[in-house]
Amino acid sequence: MFKDLRSLFVATALLIMSAAAASAQDSAQDYPQWRGRNRDGAASGFTEPKAWPEKLTRRWKVEVGEGYATPIVVGKTVYAFTRRDGAETMTALDAATGKLIWRTEYPAPYKVIDAAAAHGAGPKATPLFHGGNLYTVGVSGAVSAFNAATGKLLWQKPAPAEHPVFGMAASPIGDKDLVILHPGSYGPLTAYDANTGAVRWAADGNGAYASPIIVELGGVRQIVTMTQKNVISVAVADGAPLWERPWKSAGTDSAITPIVYGETIIVASQRMPVTALKPTRRDGKWVVEVVWENKDVSLFMSNPALIGDTLFGLSEKSSGQFFGIDAKTGKTLWLGQPREASNTAVVKAGDLLFMLNDDAELIVSRGSQTGFEPVKRYTVADSATWAQPAISGNRVFVKDVTSLALWTLK
C-alpha cells in the first residue's frame, strides 16, 4: 500500500511539475488574457497557410460548462472559466489532447434576468494568467486567484452586494504585483495585491462591462477604461485620477475595450459614435481632445481590431454590418452588407481577420481598405458561440454553449 501511495505521489508531483513547466514554454504562442497578449485582439504566432483547407480539423471537444469567457492558452495548457451545476469552475486541460489536468470550483448562485436568459448565467469575464497564477471575476463579482499549475485556490474576495444588471463582464488586467479590475456595478476600479488579495488602491467610477487597458501616455503608465458615465484614466502605480471624458452609452452598456492608436484612444459603445480621444498633458494638467467621431458605425458587444491604420469590426447598425474605418481621420472606408451577423468576435493575425459569429460561423477575411474580403468560411460548433476564440499558433480554441474544442488547419 505504501508503495502504491508513493507511486501516486510521484505521478501527481510529475503532473504538477509538467503543468508548471508548460507555463514557461511556447510563450510566443501564449494567449494569456482577454483579447490576447497585448489586449488588442491579436492572435499569437499564427502563420497563414499557402492554401486554406475546405474544412478545419477538430482535434478534440470537451464538455467544460456554460459561460462565454474566452479560453486562455499558456504553454501546453488551455484554461476555461465556466459554470457547472451552480458552481463557477476553473478547468485546466492539456491543449494538445483536451485531457483534464485539474478542475477547481466554488459555489456561485446567480439568477439571470429575463433579458439575458439566452446568454445563460455566465461567467463572462475572461481569466488572466499573470505571474504563474490565474485570476478570475465571477458573474456576481467574486474575485479569485488560483495556482495555474495545481488549481489551488490561493485567495478569494466574495461577490459584492450589487453587480451590473447583466452580470460582471469586465476582465482583469495585471501589472507587476497588481491585479486590477472593476469588482461590481457600484464598485470602484480596484487594484489587488496579486499574492494576497489585499486592496492596494481604489479609484472612483462605477463599473461598466468594458475591460481596462494599460497604456503609456505623456510618459505616464495609466489604466484607461469605461465607467457607467465616463472614459477614465488613472495612474497604474497608485490609482490617482489623471483624466476623464464624459461618456454615456445607452443604459450602462459600455462593453467595448478601448483601443490604442498612436497617441489616441479609440472608444465606442451602444448607440454612440466611434470616437478617437487624444489625452495630452499641458502645464501639469491633462486635456482630452476629440480627434474625430464616426457616426456611421456604432458598437454594442463586438470589439473591433486595428490593422495598421484601419479599424475593422461589426457595427450594430443595419442589424450587423462589417466595416472599415480610417483610424487617422475617422472616415468610413467601407460598409458591408446589412444583417451579416448579430454579434462577432474579432481576432487579427497579420493582415487577416478571424470573425467568429455567434451562430458558430468562423469567417476568415482580408483586412482590406476597400471592402469586405472573405477568404474562407468555416462552421466550428454545433451551438451558439458568444465567447471570443483563442488563436495560439495555428490552433483555434472555440468555446460554444457548454463545450471547448480545438480546431486546426490540417
How should each PLM-predicted stretch be described?
Residues 1-12:
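Bacterial N-terminal signal peptides that target proteins for export
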Residues 10-21:
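Hydrophobic helical h-region of N-terminal Sec-dependent signal peptides
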Residues 22-410:
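Noncatalytic, solvent-exposed loop/strand surfaces
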